[in-house]
Amino acid sequence: MPAYRSRTTTHGRNMAGARGLWRATGMKDSDFGKPIIAVVNSFTQFVPGHVHLKDLGQLVAREIEAAGGVAKEFNTIAVDDGIAMGHDGMLYSLPSREIIADSVEYMVNAHCADAMVCISNCDKITPGMLMAALRLNIPAVFVSGGPMEAGKVVLHGKKHALDLVDAMVAAADDSVSDEDVKVIERSACPTCGSCSGMFTANSMNCLTEALGLSLPGNGSTLATHADRKRLFVEAGHLVVDLARRYYEQEDERILPRSVASKKAFENAMALDIAMGGSTNTVLHILAAAYEGEVDFTMDDIDRLSRKVPCLSKVAPAKSDVHMEDVHRAGGIMSILGELEKGGLINRDCPTVHSETIGDAIDRWDITRTSSETVRNFFRAAPGGIPTQVAFSQEARWDDLDTDREKGVIRSVEHPFSKDGGLAVLKGNIALDGCIVKTAGVDESILKFSGPARVFESQDASVKAILGNEIKAGDVVVIRYEGPKGGPGMQEMLYPTSYLKSKGLGKACALITDGRFSGGTSGLSIGHVSPEAANGGTIGLVREGDIIDIDIPNRTISLRVDEAELATRRAEQDAKGWQPAEQRKRRVTTALKAYAAFATSADRGAVRDLGDR
């Protein structure tokens, strides 16, 4: 039977000093011997998705102690990708994922915690904590802060549902008046919570449900709704139960690596493809699998993308549908339920809350459950009142969206498309693959060919787009923005948003070794691997070269013969794989440290220390 890890610091005469320090934190004689549970919070006033988390850590802590554990809270950092967007701040976003994972490991191992509750929400925080959980492999439960309500505004007599991306697009569209931009800006992000579309934060919180590490409803229950409080209360009790099951009953089925098995990763990726999740999830799923020593690669994603249909389209793919609408349609368990009916889910994977994910689907899918409690849970609606307070409203929809033919969630017989919402493309420009969010691509441009417009940085591309230098039919190529080349693999939300503002969203393509915001739509192809800084072919593209993109056949090719590419490669080897133009970019020691070990996107942009 495994001993509680915390006994290392709480038992024995030689630990008198450590016990003295524990007592100074409030522990009493009766607490020594109880499981010590780390409450891993990520509160910050910088991020709307985390601004309401300050008191939620202590809410969980009280429930842990009521269940017989000892709760000890600490905080990680949290970067707001939207605020960091469009300037050098974005260089820090992806590297912060590794810092978060490391900081959780440092705190939990240094203090010998027995288990943990991870309170995350936004883009890199959930992935960082997930990586840590799989690295540590101690009992863990995830509970996120929840999605923001969608913005609502009436413009020129017409009602619109809004999100962050609408504000960005409107600001760059010269046809939108200053007054309308102000109205959109003030309405786009009305409450606390992660941005309201199927962007990276919400995508990742949904995937923790599919992995089996969070409670049903975690990905879709609004941050403002009173129903979300139950998830935090249950997480506190659940984690103590999991700790006892592992340390006292030797039940290893509840450990993160047992729950998040290869089959569970397949379930999560099937969900991601079906719901048209952010392309960033591919990076994070690969990185999490790496930490858990799960053999899950781009080839697995490619295999799944060829058989899983797109069952839901949410903003940015469908601008009038947001997470509150997904919840009304039954949330993640109902999407998994539709996949399961099509034989696309592994039912036998264990979860932290149910014997198997199949059992959870049977109870929580609104099209098959007999529980009125479950159905009422998914009636939780937006309150429509701007607020930064969690659990502050109790609005309910009058009815649920159970229309699986034309509703927000479709059946496998009535998909939005037979091809899923994400696809892996390969070809001479991306030998190790690249990713496109097909759910956001108009059918008219699933096949596209055009001349390359080459830029050595995101900034240069933005200048050209806003300067009307990009024309319909062009393929915008942004390189040296990968994990190593950036460094930090910036998101390209501004270039894609500005293309849309210029009326080119369905007339141009954009490819990059960088990545995209979950708010990106259009023919935006990212994660090109190998990246330019690692000698990838994207570094050999020249102005005017024709690039062919064929999403149905999963190919992307540079129309240049092998002999010419070999000549260009020899020339580039001599020059060194770095931008041809000097960039005004301050790369600090911290960023250099990340770049020194960063791998390309096909490996999740994890650090390669040469130990595997």
From Swiss-Prot:
State the EC number(s).
4.2.1.9
Q: Does the keyword Iron-sulfur apply?
A: yes
One GO CC term, this protein: cytosol
List the active-site residues. 517
Reactions catalysed according to its record? (2R)-2,3-dihydroxy-3-methylbutanoate = 3-methyl-2-oxobutanoate + H2O; (2R,3R)-2,3-dihydroxy-3-methylpentanoate = (S)-3-methyl-2-oxopentanoate + H2O
Which residues does this entry mark as bearing N6-carboxylysine? 124
Coiled-coil stretches are: none
Q: Tell me the protein family, please.
A: Belongs to the IlvD/Edd family.
Q: What is this protein called?
A: Dihydroxy-acid dehydratase
What organism does the record attribute this protein to? Sinorhizobium fredii (strain NBRC 101917 / NGR234)
Q: Which gene encodes it?
A: ilvD
